[in-house]
Swiss-Prot record:
Gene Ontology biological process terms in this record: tRNA N1-guanine methylation
Organism: Staphylococcus aureus (strain NCTC 8325 / PS 47)
Gene: trmD
Pfam families, A to Z: tRNA_m1G_MT
Protein name: tRNA (guanine-N(1)-)-methyltransferase
InterPro entries for the chain: Alpha/beta_knot_MTases, tRNA_m1G_MeTrfase_C_sf, tRNA_m1G_MeTrfase_TrmD, tRNA_m1G_MTases_N, tRNA_MeTrfase_TRMD/TRM10
Length: 245
């Protein structure tokens, strides 16, 4: 996969994208990363990338020319996903990360200031994505967050493919509780089932914990999850236990 970032602050990406999984993905030729400062594509001697909005209003708007010019220098095809980071976009999710992990080429347009000239949105962009109902100073942090979520899903990046399959949201539920040594710490012990060596019982316990954890922390996900009769019985027993205290 190749990822290009159009940004006014390319140095922001240096630390995040050159460590841990991102670094290994690049070293193993699973990922190619390129940052482009679209200020270099401004059309006047002052390298101006923003201007006042037509019709009046507060703030500055990113001009179309630098972004369009920068895009012309990229190897963009009809299959390239061009992503605009903006509050009005589709909320980012694990499902969206899975979809984007199958792309060969992604371009993130990371804006600043009040917003973008609408012609950028309507003529260059394939996806508008939001990280939530709040506003950030620029698109760089959301782009880096999305990159991490996407790249770890590329086959061969994590090494152990089971790793991301056990993650929260991978099957619509939150992840089960995890434990490691020591077996007992400050009077707190690891559940016996995890030490039993019985993998069927361990899998059943983990699924039960995922259901209960999701029910407690993200009831909206439980409403969407295709509960089996066995799942419903697990949750019903849990609810009865809560009432009994």
């Amino acid at each position: 996969m190749k990822i290009d970032y159009l940004t006014l602050f390319p140095e922001m990406f240096d630390g995040v994208l050159n460590h841990s999984i991102m670094k290994r993905a690049q070293e193993n030729n699973k990922l190619q990363i390129n940052t482009v400062n679209f200020r270099d594509y401004a059309i006047n001697k002052h390298n101006q990338v923003d201007d006042y909005p037509y019709g009046g209003g507060q703030g500055m708007v990113l001009k179309p020319e630098p972004v369009f010019n920068a895009m012309e220098d990229l190897d963009v095809t009809e299959q390239t996903r061009v992503i605009l980071m903006c509050p009005q976009g589709e909320p980012f999710s694990h499902q969206k990360a899975v979809e984007l992990s199958k792309a060969d080429h992604i371009v993130f347009i990371c804006g600043h200031y009040e917003g973008y000239d609408e012609r950028i949105r309507t003529h260059l962009v394939t996806d508008e994505i939001s990280m939530g109902d709040y506003v950030l100073t620029g698109g760089e942090l959301p782009a880096m967050t999305m990159t991490d979520a996407i790249v770890r899903l590329i086959p061969g990046v994590l090494g152990n493919e089971q790793s991301h399959q056990d993650d929260s949201f991978s099957d619509g539920l939150l992840e089960f509780p995890q434990y490691t040594r020591p077996r007992e710490f400050k009077g707190l012990t690891v559940p016996d089932v995890l030490l039993s060596g019985n993998h069927a019982n361990i899998d059943a316990w983990r699924h039960e914990q995922k259901l209960i954890r999701t029910y407690n922390k993200r009831p909206d996900l439980i409403e969407k999850y295709p509960l089996t009769n066995a799942d419903k019985q697990i949750l019903e027993r849990y609810k009865i236990g809560l009432k009994k205290g």
